[in-house]
């Protein structure tokens, strides 16, 4: 079980990312566009740099949806490898079977 503070911090970051997503994409489009003027591009770069660090989606951490474990995250399930194994053995994940060949 991860610390509650780490889970809450990641949730707060996710909310910040969602809040600034449209602004970030607009600024990044201006920066990437070859047709934008150099002064317009530099203005967009400064505006992007002024945004909070937590507005960047790179700072989000994939965590287990049940207990918040940060490592061994399986994107398909939204759970850690430990939790997937436990739930699969208990039969709580439909369609998941233990491999046998």
Curated annotation (Swiss-Prot):
Keywords: Ribonucleoprotein, Ribosomal protein, RNA-binding, rRNA-binding. Coiled coil: none annotated. InterPro entries: Ribosomal_uS14 (IPR001209), Ribosomal_uS14_bac/plastid (IPR023036). The keyword Ligase does not apply. GO terms for cellular component: peptidoglycan-based cell wall; small ribosomal subunit. GO terms for molecular function: rRNA binding; structural constituent of ribosome. The keyword Lipid metabolism does not apply. Residues 33-45 have a biased composition (Polar residues). Residues 28-57 are annotated as: Disordered. GO terms for biological process: translation. Transmembrane segments: none annotated. Pfam families: Ribosomal_S14. Belongs to the universal ribosomal protein uS14 family. Part of the 30S ribosomal subunit. Contacts proteins S3 and S10. HAMAP family: Ribosomal_uS14_1 (MF_00537). Binds 16S rRNA, required for the assembly of 30S particles and may also be responsible for determining the conformation of the 16S rRNA at the A site. This is Small ribosomal subunit protein uS14A. The gene is rpsN.
């Amino acid at each position: 079980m991860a610390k509650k503070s780490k889970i809450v911090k990641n949730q707060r970051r996710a909310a910040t990312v969602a809040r600034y997503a449209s602004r970030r994409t607009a600024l990044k489009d201006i920066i990437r566009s070859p047709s934008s003027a150099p002064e317009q591009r530099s203005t967009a770069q400064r505006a992007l740099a002024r945004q909070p660090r937590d507005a960047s989606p790179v700072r989000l951490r994939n965590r287990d949806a049940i207990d918040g474990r940060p490592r061994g995250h399986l994107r398909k399930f939204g759970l850690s490898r430990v939790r997937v194994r436990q739930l699969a053995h208990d039969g709580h994940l439909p369609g998941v079977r233990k491999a046998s060949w």
